[in-house]
Amino acid sequence: MIKIKMSFVFFLGIVLYSGLLNELSNLFLTILIHEAGHLFFILLFKQKIKSVEFTGFGIFINVSLSTNNILKKLLIFGGGILSNLIFILIIKSRITYDYHKIMIFLNLIPIIPLDGFQMVNVLLSCFYEDEFINDVLFYVGTLILSLLLIFSLIFK
């Protein structure tokens, strides 16, 4: 099921009104390539897609994982990052490189709902309970975001 959130419609309106159609089209293409990486592994491992949501913050594929295989889960959650990395290696455009590099960096941050959180969660679930993992990742994610904010203010 495809869901289009109101925030996505609002985002499209801003894109059309702002005059940044080219830049935001590149961003949207980067997001599509990222999600295609997830989709590739979801279909490869025959997992069930519950929905695809278009929001003002991106696209989210909600999948019902029926596998306990850690490698398969890591490939599904890391598939977006892999597709961005492959795209960087194939396409040598500086603009494209920057968008994909940022997408990779942001998705490696271990905060919900990003890929970094999902991958670390899969790895830690082999050793710890979900509640402990969520608590640890909450504090780690908060620390990382705080450091990013501080660095962005210091090194403008």
Role assignments for model-derived ranges:
Residues M1-K156:
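Hydrophobic transmembrane alpha-helices and their immediate loop junctions
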